[in-house]
Amino acid sequence: MKKLILVIVVLLMIAACGQSYEETKRITREQRREAMRKDSAALKVAVMPTLDCLPLYVAQYYQLFDTLNGGVRLKFYNAQMDCDTAILRGRVEGVITDLVRAKRMEKQGLKMRYVAATNAYWQLVTNRNARIRQLRQLDDKMVAMTRFSATDLLTDRARDSVKLAPNQVFKVQINDLNVRVQMLQNNEIDALWLPEPQATQARLMKNPVIMDSRSVKLQLGVLAFREQEMRRQARGKQLALFTQAYNQSCDSISKYGIAYYRDLLIEHCKVKSQLIDSIPQDIRYAHAHGPRQQDVAYVEQWLQKIDTLKTNARNGNK
């Protein structure tokens, strides 16, 4: 009798475990579907550990995006090319990028809606041990940049300004900003383009700056969204509310200063507190408005030149 009772108890336990396991699987599937639904409804924006993304970090922290149906989700990347891949493949609806990359993606068939021209700028920093103090000294030197981006265009601008031939300056594609900084620290690169706050980090290490994108009057930073997605009524409403929150953040940063948001920069840009005090505090954040036509024209002209050179090179090899 005791054995029979024991068998019954064991069978009941097995049945209970089986039900528990199946129930757990069902709940997990439901949770996964719910997470996917929420992610799909949210407005997703690809961002980087750079200062031009600060308005989005501020808006997220102070819950300015909470009025959006579905909310906003920031997707973090360390390389501009990874951000652009995310929007090309539909993983995000928006991206903080540069005008060259955005126009390049449009040439590849992705229509973009330009919501804001950001205050992004890039500095050409040289390795202090390379003793490069002028642009003409880039002859036979390696410059870290990203192909078909603002830094690619700016490298050409720097090279052409001192009449160096294309084969005299070696462009090295290093997409990850952290890797660029590490290469500078390890004396593995002669020169490199850096945005803020990475440029400040390089300057604090006593590395010279020989060119600044602001000195050539180019404003190349942009916040752009997938045009086709934004034509949907629900997305259009989200974008309008997103823009309001973005403008509020810009006003707040301009009022209180960059250093006021020290904790956000430490968290998202992975920099030390002392570095933030060395970032130029006169940087301003403007309300959302599209890029200037003069910048668009310059970028399109440069991209056309690159395409022509590639076509001529292919024809010459035939």
Q: Language-model segments: what does each one mean?
A:
Residues 15-16:
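C-terminal motif of bacterial Sec signal peptides marking the signal peptidase cleavage site
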Residues 21-165, 171-172, 183, 190-196, ...:
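Short, glycine-/small- and polar/acidic-enriched structural segments
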